[in-house]
Amino acid sequence: MDALFVPLAGAVGASVDQVKLISCLLIAYPLGSVFVRIPSDKPTLRHLFNISVSLFYFFPMLGMYTGFLQLLGDILITYFAAKFSSTSKIMPWFIFLFILGHLMFNHIIRVIYDLSYETIEVTGPQMVLTMKLTTFAWNVWDGRRDPKDLDKWQLEKSVREFPSLLEFLGYALYFPGVLVGPSLEFTDYINLVHERTFTAPGKHEGGRRLPAGRKRVGYRKMVTGLAFLGVFVVFGGSNNYSVMVTPWFAEQSWLKRVLLAQLYGTCERTKYYAIWTLTEGASILTGNGFTGFTPSGQSTWNGAANVIPTVIEFPSNFKVLLDSWNMKANVWLRECVYKRITPKGQKPGFWSSMLTFATSAFWHGAQVGYYLTFLMGGFITSAARLARMNFRPFFLPAEGQPITTAKRLYDFVGALVSLLVLNYVASPFMLLTWENSITGWTRLGWYGHVVVMGSLLFFYVGGSGFCRSLQKKRGISSKKVASASGAATPVAEKTFQVPPALDKIVPPPI
């Protein structure tokens, strides 16, 4: 089948693997419309449809025969381990460690063979499947626990009636998300198949329980995803982080290199925006992602989102930027790691955060560049929080007063610094190796480290105390300081893809 894609790959300047992947994502749109036309009272047909489409992706389209057998092995091991050990406390941990260990093994193989990110192989689908299988194991365990011991999420997602093998295969191979996500929980999949998710008061399609508005939102996501893809195809080939390690880049002035890094970072992100937005749209067409109705009765479909590009490109601060990236992975880390490693009756602490971060790092891959990016992320979140706590109160308007020019300027500078730091710290994530990552940072003059570490140094050698005393002298109320600082971040809003922030481990002197 490669012969069909070679001319197109040559025309757009992409690899054959990339073209085949995008083709699978686009094929999912008409197939999503077919899926919803299978009667919901015939769930077996819907499960078989999911399985059949995924087999079509893996075999004739992508040629991932060995890779699929590995995925199938993980699926069957998870299913039977959960089925015959559902009441064992060890079961979810066994599945978690086995599935994550298998993924890490394949990540190492990818490093050994030096496969580029353009090569489509098993680790991409396996990362999604890892989230689904490990979440399922915990959901089954929650279904055997006393409901009084469960929180709201655990109670809603718990699996109390163990599924048939066909149902589980349909879930694991749910076709819109089988290659690159989005991930979803088993209860959500079953509710989708039986159309239990949808309730009045909105309009419905063709007498079915499926709310109207699904196609409008889904195809809008497709257009948006294709637009991002177009940007990447046109500009990404010559504007990416790999240019930073070329002799030409070293010959440019420092200011030009910094400006080019902003362009490279933006272009690199567009491919993720494209893929995740395309899969979100296809998922919506099957009915996944429904989040209710507006007061006017219009349906909303935000539950399948994995990224919010506008928030990332125009962030109010670094935290909201992180919260809007790879959102499904953050939910998985929170529900399947962070909450689970904390003993009952105790509050999560430093080690809970560190082990959750380590899981995130292992899940992403074995390349050194990933770890450089993630480790730096912990310092960035700390510096950003301290800046917000110490600087923001000076710019907040009095209660009941309109936003001032100074506050708008503060927000603009904060967004600009967030993007500058993001495009700096993300470069190792794409350059991958230690040598290339250090070369890239060196040619940028280590400006991200200067900004972040310089800020932390300021706050830790007396800057925090100075700002607090100045706030008191200016009569800034404690209420305004609390408003600027924010309350302790709820578990549901924590970011788990970076290590614990320094200020949470060793607070600066005040």
Language-model features and meaning:
Residues 1-510:
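Non-catalytic, membrane-anchoring transmembrane segments at the edges
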